[in-house]
Regions:
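Short HxH-centered metal-ligating active-site micro-motif
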Residues: 1-2
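A conserved active-site cap/scaffold subdomain adjacent to cofactor or substrate pockets
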Residues: 135-165, 170, 175-176
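Histidine/acidic-residue-rich, glycine-tolerant segments that coordinate divalent metal ions
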Residues: 5-9, 13-139, 148
Length: 176
């Protein structure tokens, strides 16, 4: 959707320039991993925008508007916990739940939100709950966090705090 919408804007801009006899060069770059791995960062690093006077992008949203500015710096990081499986009814005391660690981490991060800058955002998704059997203490679980703030040093600070919360969750559940 993003690539198609941006390509349509390139075609419209080309037509506008031709109609108004405007000189210039238009370059269209697809930017893979728009949010997850930051495809644009590699293009910037490799000099694709060095002689560029203007860079435009398009992103779907509600309504129509033009905006300017910058987006937030972000880290996306997986946290994987490993525990000890056990039968949850017969011998739960032998288990160490990786899923409990993920849930405690999520609670800790949610409480941290009150104590971070207003412009920061932290989102998460449980990507592996350990299985679909509720009668088993889950030995592996994983959560993906997206940590965002206006500046990279702010993201790094939040990332370190999130890592400490993960360590605390592992300590509480005797998982790794």
């Amino acid at each position: 959707l993003i690539g198609t919408g941006t390509l349509a804007s390139v075609i419209a801009l080309k037509d506008f320039m031709k109609e108004h006899n405007l000189k210039g060069t238009i370059r269209y770059y697809g930017c893979p991993a728009e949010e997850n791995a930051g495809g644009k960062a590699f293009l910037v690093r490799d000099g694709y925008f060095n002689d560029c006077d203007l860079a435009l992008c398009w992103h779907p949203e509600q309504g129509r508007r033009a905006c300017y500015g910058s987006t937030k710096a972000n880290f996306r990081v997986f946290f994987t916990f490993h525990g000890t499986p056990a039968h949850a009814s017969m011998c739960p005391e032998l288990g160490r739940s990786a899923l409990d660690a993920v849930e405690l981490m999520d609670v800790g991060v949610n409480y941290m939100r009150e104590h971070m800058i207003d412009e920061a955002r932290i989102h998460y998704a449980i990507t592996d709950a350990g299985g679909d059997a509720p009668n088993v203490v889950q030995s592996r679980a994983q959560v993906l966090y997206a940590i965002r703030a206006p500046k990279i040093p702010q993201v790094k600070e939040l990332y370190n705090r999130v890592c400490n919360i993960a360590k605390g969750a592992a300590l509480m559940t005797e998982t790794t």
